[in-house]
């Protein structure tokens, strides 16, 4: 994604002081242009302030952003910001099915995104999303997903 010009951000409700060192230790920090912790801004998810901030800094409209999350607050924040959300069926969601939040797509394994990442002809359908140009897109990732998403989303493709 980085080579394709897609900028990524990590947005979490965990304090930033814990997130950045962990990313650096795992040699993943360089993949994220923005790291927004729960104490970075006055508001935490599900407030969309962090998403609005990242989109403004990237110069990317909501129609060209994608949010990958694993909790109710992730889906709510994405919806409030007008951003499509791919939700994982596992993760921190207080035992409730994430599908109840009606994200654009629910997957139970990040590897399900791989066909769209590795094969330029493969398509992942996300309703109501406009196809962005590769340079004008951003992926926002939350919580512990960043490790898996970096590997899985090497070449993200989707269409409306």
From Swiss-Prot:
Its EC number is 3.1.3.18. Pathway: Organic acid metabolism; glycolate biosynthesis; glycolate from 2-phosphoglycolate: step 1/1. Its cofactor is Mg(2+). InterPro entries: HAD-like_hydrolase_sf, HAD-like_sf, HAD-SF_hydro_IA, HAD_2, HAD_sf. GO terms for molecular function: metal ion binding; phosphoglycolate phosphatase activity. Belongs to the HAD-like hydrolase superfamily. CbbY/CbbZ/Gph/YieH family. This is Probable phosphoglycolate phosphatase. It comes from Pseudomonas savastanoi.
């Amino acid at each position: 994604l980085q080579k394709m010009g897609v900028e990524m951000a990590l947005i979490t409700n965990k304090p930033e002081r814990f997130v950045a060192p962990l990313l650096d230790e795992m040699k993943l920090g360089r993949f994220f242009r923005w790291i927004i912790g729960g104490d970075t801004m006055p508001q935490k998810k599900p407030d969309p302030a962090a998403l609005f901030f990242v989109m403004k800094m990237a110069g990317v409209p909501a129609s060209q952003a994608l949010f990958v999350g694993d909790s109710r607050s992730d889906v709510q924040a994405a919806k409030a910001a007008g951003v499509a959300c791919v939700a994982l069926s596992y993760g921190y969601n207080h035992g409730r099915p994430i599908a109840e939040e009606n994200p654009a797509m629910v997957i139970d394994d990040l590897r399900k995104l791989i066909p769209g990442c590795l094969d330029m002809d493969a398509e992942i359908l996300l309703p109501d999303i406009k196809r962005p140009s590769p340079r004008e897109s951003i992926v926002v990732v939350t919580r512990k997903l960043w490790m898996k998403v970096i590997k899985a989303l090497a070449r993200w493709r989707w269409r409306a």
